[in-house]
């Protein structure tokens, strides 16, 4: 199906609820949308994919009536809002009452200091009766599992909790079309699941959903998928149709869904399976071919697949024992509450963010902190970076207590803090000036500052962008520019708060490559992440729950079968390859070990199938035309 046909198709007997025809929109000299034509049917769920800067958020703003294009025609919920180069403002006002939008960043949408008041803000502006508003607020807070926080201050909530409040506020206006601009980018596993359950429920009540996302698996439940590239529709169709163009999808800076990637890996290894992006279909096919397999001499090898997440750890595991160096970070019985004033007086209802945390971070290690939103991960990072000090207990970084005001100044150049969405800290006129700010404030000479700026920009792949405005870079490039400013200070410890959140797959891959290189060169990394696949790459994983560290160990230890129920109860998941392996085992397959990557899982499956006589699945020849 062609991109144009798929993007514009709608039932002939039914007028589309959203219609864009040859829409063009530019920001100055930058063309954000370039001749986009798109029809969305009533009750349809449409997913919009694309790399950072492809035009997704601009398209979302046009669909929800926030932006008028420069050219083309736009019809929203039956209102012709733009045609013949002019906007009809009365039509826009009528249409906006039936349109809802959830922004990418919840801070841009929250307007009050109490959760229930924020959810009520939209219905109040529609002039609804108070009793109706009260009903809507209760219903939508319950829908997003935030009813217990009705009286809370949104500023005191975690990022994921704030996002759920904005979704409730949009739904409280009962829109006919709801536009979601990456609503789950800052959520934990439980939060993402709850949001996607809400999205699925909307289908049953006839609400049309236009969903912008960087998570390929979220797109699998859509009726149609549209992929944008430089403001144009590059691919469109059902999820299976779009993702079957694997090479083209990768060329657009995206990635295949997990099932598509795994089935391709299996075909590359000669296993005769059909390519699919349907995880249940792949599971069923593999279960038929592997169930009841007897234990084989290869089983022991399979059990070790994926349990070592890095070559460095594998080398260290076989090296002779040696005395452990002093940890880069040591936290002892750390307690912290946001309810304390500067004079350290406790407010009676102060929430306890950290409650007796103990954690050692080995020098040169990569440590991942995981936990549901509100578990204390970001708070612990701030304390490690000496941005706050513990109420009780002690944190030492490189042997220096963060509570020692006189000595902790030495940490300013040694600890780099990469905040959530670090691009928000950009401020200078040029990229070079922004990156130079930190080393300049360390008192370095102009020549040394220039050298550090050049090396940092080379490291993050922004060579040649010295004189560009950081605000004209793509979202992914802005993230790298902010990281370069931190790296230019030469830190031995990087603490990163969800560094890949909001990045497209290519941006995530580039950032992971940079961080892996820094870690291999000796930089200690402490990273907060909601992606279990990212946590699986670390040397150590620490799980926080209720302000406490409740599990620590290697990824294989933390994600082991004995912890599965405990992790589930805490609202966490496990890496997708490991979850799929366990689902296969539940379906009757022999144990596949603990594969933490799709490559390790594919190896384990092929090994198992290859040792079972008479399996329905066969090993295809390398020349088999079905191999991709």
Specify the residue positions occupied by each region the protein language model found:
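ABC ATPase C-loop
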Residues: 165, 170-171, 486-487
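ABC ATPase NBD Q-loop/coupling interface
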Residues: 73-94, 394-410
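Conserved ABC ATPase "signature" region
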Residues: 131-149, 447-465
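Conserved ABC ATPase signature
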Residues: 153-157, 161, 469-473, 477
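Catalytic Walker B motif of ABC-type/P-loop ATPase nucleotide-binding domains
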Residues: 178-181, 494-497
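Helix-to-loop junction immediately C-terminal to a conserved catalytic motif
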Residues: 64, 385
């Amino acid at each position: 199906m062609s991109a144009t046909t798929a993007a514009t198709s709608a039932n002939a007997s039914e007028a589309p609820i959203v219609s864009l025809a040859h829409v063009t929109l530019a920001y100055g000299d930058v063309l954000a949308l370039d001749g986009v034509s798109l029809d969305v049917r009533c009750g349809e769920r449409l997913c919009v994919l694309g790399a950072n800067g492809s035009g997704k958020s601009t398209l979302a703003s046009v669909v929800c009536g926030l932006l008028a294009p420069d050219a083309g025609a736009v019809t929203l919920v039956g209102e012709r809002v733009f045609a013949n180069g002019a906007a009809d403002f009365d039509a826009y006002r009528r249409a906006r009452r039936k349109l809802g939008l959830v922004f990418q960043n919840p801070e841009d949408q929250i307007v009050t200091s109490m959760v229930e008041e924020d959810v009520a803000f939209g219905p109040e502006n529609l002039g609804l009766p108070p009793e109706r508003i009260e009903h809507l607020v209760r219903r939508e807070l319950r829908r997003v599992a935030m009813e217990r926080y009705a009286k809370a201050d949104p500023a005191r909530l975690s990022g994921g909790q704030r996002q759920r409040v904005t979704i409730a506020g949009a739904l409280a206006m009962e829109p006919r079309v709801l536009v979601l601009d990456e609503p789950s980018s800052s959520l934990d596993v439980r939060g993402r699941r709850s949001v996607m359950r809400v999205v699925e429920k909307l289908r049953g009540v006839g609400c049309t959903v236009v969903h912008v996302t960087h998570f390929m698996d979220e797109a699998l439940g859509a009726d149609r998928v549209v992929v944008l590239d430089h403001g144009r529709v590059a691919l469109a169709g059902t999820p299976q149709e779009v993702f079957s163009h694997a090479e083209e999808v990768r060329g657009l800076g995206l990635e295949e869904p997990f099932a598509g990637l795994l089935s391709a890996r299996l075909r590359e290894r000669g296993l005769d399976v059909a390519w699919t992006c349907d995880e249940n279909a792949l599971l069923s096919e593999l279960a038929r071919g592997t169930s009841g397999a007897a234990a084989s001499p290869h089983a022991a090898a399979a059990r070790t697949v994926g349990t070592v997440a890095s070559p460095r750890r594998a080398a260290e595991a076989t090296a002779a024992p040696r005395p452990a160096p002093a940890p880069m970070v040591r936290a002892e019985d750390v307690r912290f509450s946001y309810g304390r004033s500067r004079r350290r007086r406790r407010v009676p209802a102060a929430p306890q963010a950290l409650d007796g945390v103990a954690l050692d971070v080995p020098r040169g290690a990569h440590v991942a902190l995981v936990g549901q939103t509100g578990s204390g991960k970001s708070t612990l990072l701030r304390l490690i970076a000496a941005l706050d000090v513990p109420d009780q207990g002690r944190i030492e970084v490189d042997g220096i207590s963060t509570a020692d005001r006189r000595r902790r100044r030495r940490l300013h150049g040694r600890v780099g803090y990469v905040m959530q969405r670090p691009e928000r800290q950009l401020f200078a006129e040029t990229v070079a000036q922004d990156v130079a700010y930190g080393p300049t404030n360390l008192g370095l000479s102009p020549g040394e500052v220039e050298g550090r700026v050049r090396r940092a920009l080379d490291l993050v792949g922004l060579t040649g962008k010295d004189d560009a405005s950081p605000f004209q870079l793509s979202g992914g490039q802005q993230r790298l520019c902010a990281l370069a400013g931190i790296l230019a200070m030469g830190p031995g410890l990087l603490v990163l708060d969800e560094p890949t959140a909001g990045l497209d797959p290519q941006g995530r891959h580039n950032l992971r490559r940079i961080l892996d290189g820094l870690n291999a060169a000796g930089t200690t990394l402490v990273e907060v992440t909601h992606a279990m696949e990212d946590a699986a790459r670390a040397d150590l994983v620490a799980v926080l729950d209720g302000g406490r560290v409740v599990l620590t160990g290697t990824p294989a230890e933390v994600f082991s079968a004995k912890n599965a129920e405990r992790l589930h109860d805490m609202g966490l998941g496990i890496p997708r390859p490991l979850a799929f392996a366990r689902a296969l085992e539940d379906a009757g397959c022999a144990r596949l070990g603990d594969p933490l990557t799709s490559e390790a899982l594919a190896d384990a499956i092929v090994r198992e199938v290859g040792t079972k006589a008479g399996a329905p699945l066969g090993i295809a020849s390398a020349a088999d035309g079905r191999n991709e």
